[in-house]
Design a protein with these regions (language model features):
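Non-catalytic pre-domain segments flanking phosphatase-related domains
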Residues: 1-8, 179-192
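Active-site neighborhood of HAD-like aspartate-dependent phosphohydrolases
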Residues: 1-47
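Short, solvent-exposed loop/turn segments at secondary-structure junctions
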Residues: 20-21, 54-59, 131
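Substrate-recognition element of Asp-dependent hydrolases with the DxDx(T/V) motif
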Residues: 32, 36-72, 82-98
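Anion (oxyanion) recognition and catalysis
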Residues: 37-41, 77, 135
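Structural recognition of alpha->loop->beta junctions
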Residues: 69-85, 157-183
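Conserved Lys-Pro-Asp/Glu-containing loop-to-beta segment of HAD-superfamily phosphomonoesterases
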Residues: 101-134
Length: 192
């Protein structure tokens, strides 16, 4: 089983001013959902791991969050793909929990729920905290997409400075990430 763990805000959807509190405020980045659907159709299990501190701060409630995620799931399904699950941390940074990225709690929950080896996991996101959380449990393939928080990064060589986890691959967007992953999988299959 291969699992691709995506960050949500800034990776799948356009970042809002503060918190995305309604389904109408959740706007996908062009091409992002198509890339997710493509990976899903290629046999990847797609899982979302997202910090949602607006819950802990009372800015958004769980019903609104579920409505946002329902919209996201339906849009991916309309493209022939599937998101298997959404894992979220509801805590604010002041709560010092073990699930708020960059802490590894969400990634551990995903690994344990699916019963997969770290070698079968790939993490992709636009935020340092997402990749740090994945690196903390030993996810071997880390992928930065230069959207959202990383949109202003200038990484001409593809080599990221500290504190980015060593070996992080850099892609312009999720379409480029999907191209990379599917090409790598095809090359691996051809080699056998």
């Amino acid at each position: 089983m291969k699992i691709a763990i995506f960050d949500r805000d800034g990776t799948l959807n356009v970042l809002g001013n503060e918190y995305i509190a309604t389904p109408d405020e959740w706007i996908p980045i062009p091409g992002a959902l198509e890339a997710v659907a493509r990976l899903s159709r290629a046999g990847w299990h797609v899982v979302i791991a997202t910090n949602q501190p607006g819950l802990g701060r009372g800015v958004i409630d769980v019903h609104a969050l579920n409505a946002i995620h329902s919209r996201m799931l339906k849009q991916v399904a309309a493209l022939g793909g599937r998101i298997d699950a959404v894992f979220f941390c509801p805590h604010s940074d002041a709560e010092h929990c073990s699930c708020r990225k960059p802490a590894p709690g969400l990634m551990e929950q995903i690994r344990d729920r699916y019963g997969v080896e770290r070698s079968e996991m790939v993490a992709v996101g636009s935020a340092l905290s997402h990749l740090q959380a994945a690196a903390a449990i030993g996810v071997p393939q880390l992928h930065l997409v230069c959207t959202g928080a990383a949109a202003e990064m200038d990484v001409p060589t593809g080599v990221l400075p500290a504190p980015w986890p060593e070996g992080t691959h850099v892609h312009t967007d999720l379409t480029a990430f999907a191209d990379f992953i599917t090409a790598a999988r095809a090359a691996k299959a051809t080699a056998h």
